[in-house]
Design a protein with these regions (language model features):
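N-terminal Rossmann/SDR dinucleotide-binding element
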Residues: 1-64
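SDR active-site strand-loop-helix element
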Residues: 21, 65-69, 105-111, 159-161
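NAD(P)H-binding glycine-rich loop region in Rossmannoid oxidoreductase-like domains
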Residues: 47-85, 96-99, 114
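Glycine-rich NAD(P)-binding loop of the Rossmann-fold in SDR/ketoreductase-type enzymes
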Residues: 81-92, 127, 135-138, 198
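Conserved Rossmann-fold NAD(P)-dependent oxidoreductase catalytic core, especially the SDR/UDP-sugar
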Residues: 92-132, 152, 157
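Conserved beta-loop-beta element that borders a ligand/cofactor-binding pocket
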Residues: 142-167
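Substrate-positioning beta->alpha
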Residues: 169-175, 189-212, 219-220, 234
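Mid/C-terminal beta-alpha module of Rossmann-like enzyme folds, strongest
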Residues: 210-248
Length: 248
């Protein structure tokens, strides 16, 4: 939703079309709390990325795919669900791009391929995933890389964001807030655990900068988190300060 709004506000030209392919349609309850928002000028198509992608589509030389599909909340799903969605999804998205000659893909991966650690990670750090989510995301990255390697004019950006927070996110940050608000949050051990994160509007603005404002060829990987990263205590204290929550 944030990405579509930004594209509509700043990038859309005459005759451009936006397709939102999703398993959940506007007006329906999504995989996170709340009803999916419908926006004017967007063509919504119900689609399961785990299956072959087929719909009435006329390609242009300016087409861009933003592949955001994933099973990502962890823990919370059976192990096979991560592999089924993240790997089959990557195969079907790249097959669709190949079929229609689309040369630009942005794929949202995760910092999970690095594995659980608190040392600073760079894009050159060797991935060592230790969860089904991280393993499946790294595999999906490689599937996209194979697609790019088949034609050196293709453009692939792989983004590895940390915790994404903001309106409509309903993930870790939202649960942390409500845990404090309802008085059932407590530190289970350390207060200095690092929580690498990024604001959703900053993330989609980077998507636009990378894929729409610039042209490049090849493959690039970008970690997307604020630096320096915040600790869980810093995040909790900031939430308390701006919302007036009092802990007793």
């Amino acid at each position: 939703t944030h990405l579509i709004k930004l594209i509509k506000q700043e990038c859309l030209k005459e005759n451009d079309r936006i397709y939102d392919l999703d398993i959940v349609m506007p007006g329906e309850e999504g995989v996170v709390p709340g009803v999916v928002e419908k926006m004017e000028g967007v063509e919504y198509i119900r689609l399961d990325v785990r299956k072959e992608i087929t719909f009435d589509f006329k390609p242009t030389e300016d087409d861009i795919i933003f592949n955001l599909a994933a099973v990502h909340r962890t823990p919370g799903h059976p192990d096979e669900a991560y592999f089924e969605t993240n790997i089959l999804g990557a195969e079907n998205v790249t097959a669709f791009a190949d079929r229609y000659g689309i040369k630009k893909i942005l794929f949202t991966s995760s910092i999970a391929p690095y594995g659980a650690a608190e040392e600073l990670k760079t894009e050159d750090t060797i991935p060592m995933p230790n969860t089904p989510y991280g393993i499946s995301k790294l595999t999906a990255e490689k599937i996209h890389m194979i697609w790019q390697a088949e034609d050196d004019t293709r453009e692939l950006t792989i983004v590895r964001p940390g915790i994404v927070y903001g309106k409509g996110e309903h993930g870790n940050m939202t649960r942390l807030y409500w845990g404090q608000r309802k008085r059932y949050f407590m530190y289970t051990g350390r207060k200095d655990t690092i929580k690498a994160c990024i604001y959703v509007k900053e993330l989609v603005r980077f998507f636009k900068y990378r894929m729409i404002d610039n042209d490049f060829s090849g493959v690039d990987i970008f970690n997307c988190t604020f630096e320096p990263a915040f600790t869980i205590e810093q995040i909790v204290e900031t939430m308390k300060k701006v919302t007036g929550i009092q802990r007793t």
